[in-house]
């Protein structure tokens, strides 16, 4: 699995919506995955024997269009890998004020999943979920293809807000084609 021909950051501008606003919220299993209120990390672990986080990059960067435009935001992008297959591309945005308060809690995660920190303590309060269904021909499609996964339809994802002391951390999770194939099952 090589992503060397690409470079961090991989995220792209995505239009996110409240599930109430989306005209065509997917039915069945996909909607269940998108709207689940618990930890996606825990749910993914339940579907594999080996779970891995591969960090693609971390840095102070400006937000993309459609993201909060704060002067200083720490961005972390990772792949969540199940039994050797990348399932989820995740992009986390942490405003500088929150990063200053949290310090190493966030910046020293390394290959540990952020979801474990967010759901294992009462320091963060899970908030609203937004979803997106989109046709990617940009960096996410190229990332998927570099991982041996062809984007053959819409990619779906969710964006979750977590509040701590008045600041919001945002986690966007995009289901890669391998995950979509599993969730949707045989067509």
Curated annotation (Swiss-Prot):
Substrate binds at residues 76, 114, 173. One of its GO terms (molecular function) is chorismate lyase activity. InterPro entries: Chorismate--pyruvate_lyase, Chorismate_lyase_/UTRA_dom_sf. It catalyses: chorismate = 4-hydroxybenzoate + pyruvate. It comes from the Bacteria. Its main location: cytoplasm. One of its GO terms (cellular component) is cytosol. The keyword Cytoplasm applies. It is an enzyme of class 4 (lyase). Belongs to the UbiC family. This is Probable chorismate pyruvate-lyase. It comes from Shewanella amazonensis (strain ATCC BAA-1098 / SB2B).
